């Protein structure tokens, strides 16, 4: 029983010159989540909707796609915000660990309460980094965690309880 307000989400970077960044990976992740939650999805229709949304957009933008349980798609687009240079702490660790067994951590959905709550606790920060019940770093509320070590880019394993980012 899925409430009607529950949706699957994708947030995509749209650049005037190159189009959607990692579009195929976003569509693949959306289709995987649709299968998991039993949402009907027409990937070709989703692609056409995104292409129509991009038409005439100038400059970098953030596109947001929402898939409902009946298969309908809604979109929004907004210019990229300049976060500037924050004064004070940029990030903090979440006060409560996440449960790596929580299936919602592995899918980008409208069920984002855990992220919202932790961000609200730290209005001085632009992001909050989560750890799981084993103390493993997982992800940020609005970002992926990427560590550069000896020329390699390392990310936490998805099994730690995090969204399978498209840039992994």
Segments from the language model and where they lie:
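Helix-start/capping segments and mature chain N-termini
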Residues: 1-62, 66-168
């Amino acid at each position: 029983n899925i409430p009607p307000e529950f949706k699957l989400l994708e947030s995509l970077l749209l650049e005037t010159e190159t189009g959607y960044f990692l579009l195929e990976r976003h569509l693949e992740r959306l289709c995987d989540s649709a299968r998991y939650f039993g949402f009907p999805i027409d990937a070709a229709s989703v692609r056409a909707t995104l292409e129509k949304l991009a038409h005439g957009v100038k400059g970098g933008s953030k596109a947001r796609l929402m898939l409902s349980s009946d298969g309908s798609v809604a979109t929004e687009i907004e210019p990229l915000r300049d976060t500037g240079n924050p004064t004070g702490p940029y990030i903090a660790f979440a006060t409560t660990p996440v449960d790596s067994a929580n299936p919602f951590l592995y899918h980008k959905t409208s069920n984002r309460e855990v992220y919202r709550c932790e961000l609200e606790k730290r209005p001085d920060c632009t992001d909050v980094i989560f750890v799981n019940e084993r103390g493993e770093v997982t992800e940020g509320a609005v970002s992926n965690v990427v560590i550069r070590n000896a020329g390699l880019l390392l990310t936490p394993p998805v099994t730690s309880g995090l969204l399978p980012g498209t840039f992994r």
